[in-house]
Curated annotation (Swiss-Prot):
GO terms for cellular component: small ribosomal subunit. CDD domains: S4. InterPro entries: Ribosomal_uS4, Ribosomal_uS4_bac-type, Ribosomal_uS4_CS, Ribosomal_uS4_N, S4_RNA-bd, S4_RNA-bd_sf. Residues 16-43 are annotated as: Disordered. SUPFAM superfamilies: Alpha-L RNA-binding motif. Belongs to the universal ribosomal protein uS4 family. The keyword Ribosomal protein applies. This is Small ribosomal subunit protein uS4. It comes from Crocosphaera subtropica (strain ATCC 51142 / BH68) (Cyanothece sp. (strain ATCC 51142)). One of its GO terms (biological process) is ribosomal small subunit biogenesis. One of the primary rRNA binding proteins, it binds directly to 16S rRNA where it nucleates assembly of the body of the 30S subunit. With S5 and S12 plays an important role in translational accuracy. The lineage of its organism: Bacteria, Bacillati, Cyanobacteriota, Cyanophyceae, Oscillatoriophycideae.
Length: 202
C-alpha cells in the first residue's frame, strides 16, 4: 500500500488512538460505516492485520518499508517485535516528532523533506534516516524554519519527552542519548501479533 493521505480521524476510529498520525480524538468511539457498532467476532488473522495496520498508519510507512524493517528486525539478536518498534521509533521523522518539533509524524516528515532539519551539522532530508546515540538534531538557522518549529512546539503531539532524548527549547536542539526503551513507545500495540502476521509472508 502507498502512504495514506486520506481522512485521519476515520482511521483513528477504526484502529484506535494513533498518536503519530493525529492529535485529534474522534467523537464516536466505534468504527466508521453502517456496521461500525456491530459486535461480530473477529478472526485471529483480522486481529493481526489490524495491529500491522496500526504500525503502517501511525509511523506513515509503506507496506514495502515495513517488510524491510521486519527482515532487519529478524536478523537482530534482540526480540524481533521490540527491534521492529525500535527501528520505527528511531527514524528521523519520528524522532523529530518525539522531540516536540512537530505535532504529528506527517508534520515532522514534511519538516525533514523540506530541508528544515539538521543532523550533526548537515541538512538531512531523508525521513527514514536511522538516528543513533550521539546524534544531534537541530533546526536550520533560517527564520522560516525556526518559526515553523516554534509554532509546532506550542501544540505538541505528546506531552512527555522519552528518556533517550534531550531537547533545549532555547536553541531548538535535541540529542539522542540512547535507543528508545519499549515502555516509552506511545503507540498501544501488540508487536508480537505483527511478527505473527508476517511469519509466513516474509
Amino acid at each position: 500500500m502507498s502512504r495514506y493521505r486520506g481522512p485521519r480521524l476515520r482511521v483513528v476510529r477504526r484502529l484506535g488512538e494513533l498518536p503519530g498520525l493525529s492529535r485529534k480524538t474522534p467523537r464516536r468511539a466505534y468504527p466508521p460505516g453502517q456496521h461500525g457498532q456491530g459486535r461480530r467476532k473477529r478472526s485471529e488473522y483480522a486481529i493481526r492485520l489490524e495491529e500491522k495496520q496500526k504500525l503502517l498508519y501511525n509511523y506513515g510507512v509503506t507496506e514495502k518499508q515495513l517488510v524491510r524493517y521486519m527482515k532487519k528486525a529478524r536478523r537482530s539478536t534482540d526480540s524481533t517485535g521490540q527491534k521492529l518498534l525500535e527501528l520505527l521509533e528511531m527514524r528521523l521523522d519520528n524522532t523529530v516528532f518525539r522531540l516536540g518539533m512537530a505535532g504529528t509524524i506527517p508534520g515532522a516528515r514534511q519538516l525533514v523533506n523540506h530541508g528544515h532539519v539538521i543532523v550533526n551539522g548537515r541538512v538531512v532530508n531523508i525521513a527514514s534516516y536511522q538516528c543513533r546515540p550521539g546524534d544531534v538534531i537541530s533546526v536550520r538557522n533560517k527564520d522560516n524554519s525556526r518559526r515553523m518549529v516554534e509554532t509546532n512546539m506550542q501544540y505538541p503531539g505528546l506531552a512527555n519527552l522519552p528518556d533517550h532524548l534531550e531537547f533545549d527549547k532555547n536553541t531548538l536542539t535535541g540529542k539522542v542519548n540512547d535507543v528508545i526503551k519499549r515502555e516509552w513507545v506511545a503507540l498501544q500495540i501488540n508487536e508480537l501479533l505483527v511478527v505473527e502476521y508476517y511469519s509466513r509472508k516474509v
